[in-house]
A protein has these predicted regions:
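Short acidic/glycine-rich loops and adjacent helix/strand connectors
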Residues: 1-106
């Protein structure tokens, strides 16, 4: 089974490709510098950065793994715990990818 996993629970956007329990790629985009001036994570800023970073991070993970979207068996996303607005970005994006590819959403 080849799985695309999306993670956006806080201030890092991550996409991983896993095949039969082996991680083929794990790409992470950090927002530490963005939030540093505020002394902590600002949920609205985190969500906006996820929107900006999710597609390139996902494309990078798939390319690194050498997997085409049609070769995926399922798409998954973090459902919690985390910042609600940040989780929503990854959850809905992963749902949309699964729907577009006609694959199960986990």
């Amino acid at each position: 089974m080849t799985l695309l996993a999306i993670e956006t629970s806080c201030d890092e956007t991550s996409a991983a490709v896993i095949r039969d329990g082996v991680v083929l790629a794990n790409v992470v985009s950090s927002q530490i510098k963005l939030h540093a001036e505020y002394g902590g994570v600002v949920p609205e800023l985190a969500a906006r950065e996820h929107l900006k970073n999710l597609l390139p991070v996902t494309q990078n993970a798939l390319a690194t793994a050498g997997v085409k979207p049609a070769e995926l068996d399922a798409v998954a996303a973090t459902q919690g715990p985390g910042l609600g607005i940040a989780l929503l970005v990854g959850f809905k994006a992963a749902q949309a990818m699964a729907y577009a590819l006609d694959k199960p959403f986990l």
